Structure formats: structure tokens, C-alpha cells
Amino acid sequence: KLADKVDKSAPFLDFKHVSLTYQGAGAPTLQDMNFTVNRGDTVGIIGGTGSGKTSLVNLIPGFYPATEGEILLEGRDIRTMSDEELRGRIGVVPQKAVLFKGTIRSNLQWGKPDATEEEMWKALELAQASEVVDGKPGKLDATVAQNGKNFSGGQRQRLTIARALVRNPEILILDDSASALDYATDAKLRAAIRTLEDKTTTFIVSQRASTIRHADKIIVLDDGEIAGMGNHDELLKDCTVYQEIYYSQYPEQRGGVR
């Protein structure tokens, strides 16, 4: 049983000196990722294009094996878990929102085949997508065209997030998944996700400092290495890379009130 193998004293997730080199690549994509995450934390991951943000979160569900080091989930090396066991605990929302031809209901069932209507509506509400579905003829049974072409980019992203949330995952990974949302919807989505924090550990990859500034821990990546780690205020004080990102987005706040 899984419960027998869980180390209650261990951090929920523990990256121990993890490096990743893709097959055929000369240089490592990630080098010496070393950090712990508590259950229920929200972790923001920020950095420039090509800094390794997506590669880092793709290690958690085991999409790629670490080249060096180990990743422990409640004290267990994730390499000792089957894909089904590991990925059954994780909801991933990739950068590109993907919807399948069918209905809204059938798309949500990809996340959880036996989901009840109540669970579906709860997930839609958290993902700020309930109004979208409510406004469609047939509601949950409304048609979804191939690739969700009959929905806007922001609507597709919200429905994809709902599909990840319907399974009530222990770990939720949002990989730049709110980039097509306006700031108000993005803020509402983040507030809703914070209500899950008791049991859901959330990783948010974003180019926007505003999206991750309230995270419990922010990991700043630069060229595959950790350039800084801490909360928003700590990083704004001590991390040059974070300062550059933040002030490039909020130039009026340089030297002023944050």
C-alpha cells in the first residue's frame, strides 16, 4: 500500500540536486535543482524564454527522467512509482490548451471518467468557466469542435484548467496556462485556486510577475539554473534576475511603492 511507504516526516516534494540533459543535447537544460515544497503550497516559477521553466515542471509527472539527482514525493523516489500511480495524483494544464471533439462533458471526463455533474460544475466554477458553459445551448452537453475552435483562446484555457481540477489533484501544474486570460479573470482564477491550498500543491509557470507574486515560494530560473528562491518581497530585494523581470513589467514601481 502507498500509505505504508509514505514518510510522514519528509517534505511533500523534494528535488535533490536534480539535473536534466535532453538526449542528443550537449549542455544540460536544468542544473542542480535543489528545493523542497510543503503540501498545499503554491510555487511560482518564473524566468526568461528558454530558462527551463517547462522542463522543470515536466519532471514532476515523470514526462522526462532526471539525468542526475532524485525527486522524492513524500519520501519516495518517483522513479519507483508507476506512471498511473504518479500521474493519478497530478493535474497538468499545458501551455497550449487542448480540447477534444465532443462535448464539454466528454472533455471534462478526460480528467475524471466517473465525474459527477456536481464535480464538473465545481471545477468549472473554480476555473472561471461556469459562465462560459452556462451561456451555451445544452450547457455540459454543448458541442466542442475539433481543437475547441468554437471557443476563444481564453475559454479554451479555462476549460482545460477545469478538466485538470475535476480530478481534484494533489498536485496541480499550470504551465503558463493563463496567458490568454485578461488580468481580472487571471486574478479571480488565482484567488479560486488559493481556496484549494489545504490539500492541493500548485505549481504556476508564468511570464507575468503578477501571476506568481502571491506564491508561497517563487523559483527564479536563469539559463537552467536557480537564480533565486523566496517570496516576492525577498526576491525583489535580493535577486537581480527577478528585479529585472518585475521592473520591466512594472517600470513605474522602480524605487517606489510595490
Predicted regions and their residues:
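ABC-type nucleotide-binding domain
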Residues: 4-258
